[in-house]
Amino acid sequence: RSGDLELYTMNLDGSNVKQITNVLGYDGGAFFSPDGSKIIFRASRPKTDEEVEEYTSLLSEGLVQPTEMELFICNSDGSDLKQITFLGNSNWSPFFHPSGDKIVFSSNYESTMGFPFNIYMIDVDGKNLKRITYGKTFDSFPVFSNDGTRLAFSSNRNNGGNRDTNVFIADWKD
């Protein structure tokens, strides 16, 4: 719609389309907070003139280059936009804890080679980062059960080296 990869909301019937983000860069992977008042998402933001040129050139061809992504949170109408991670590398697949006070997400920020990806938790204000998984491959797409007693995630662990990705469900205790 805008020529950039922005976030929008709309009614289930497709009416009442509203643009939520309006900053150059790739915005995606959005989820609403349990009460519907906030949106958490991943985004890349080209900073230098060279990065802007590369981003817009690829976008004109319908492409996006894998790049650093950070997590952003805003009100469900797009107001009060804040970046909550400043970790570098790829921080993505965010999901709200049922309390609405914390976010689980996947990141490779501790990696120098691009892997592994592990699951982390952070407060919605960007404080109290905590590592949740300690895998050596790929742990991602974390989601909580509605009652907060289980965490499901995808992982390449225990796959016998064949690159299969499986779903794991873990009991969760706050």
Predicted regions and their residues:
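A flexible loop/linker signature enriched in serine peptidases of the S9 family
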Residues: R1-E6, T21-Y26, R42-E70, Q83-N91, ...
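A structural signal for the main folded, soluble domain(s) of proteins
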Residues: M10, K18, F31, R42-A43, ...
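Short loop/turn segments that connect beta-strands within beta-propeller blades
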Residues: N11-S15, N75-S79, D123-K127, W172-D174
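Residue-level detector of Asp-centered blade-edge/turn motifs that repeat once per structural unit
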Residues: P34-D35, P98-S99, N146-D147
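Hydrophobic beta-strand positions that form the internal "hydrophobic ladder"
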Residues: I39, I103-V104, L151
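Active/binding-pocket-proximal capping segment
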Residues: G88-S90, S99, V124
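A short pocket-lining beta-strand/turn micro-motif at the edge of beta-sheets
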Residues: F117, N128, F138-S140, D147-L151
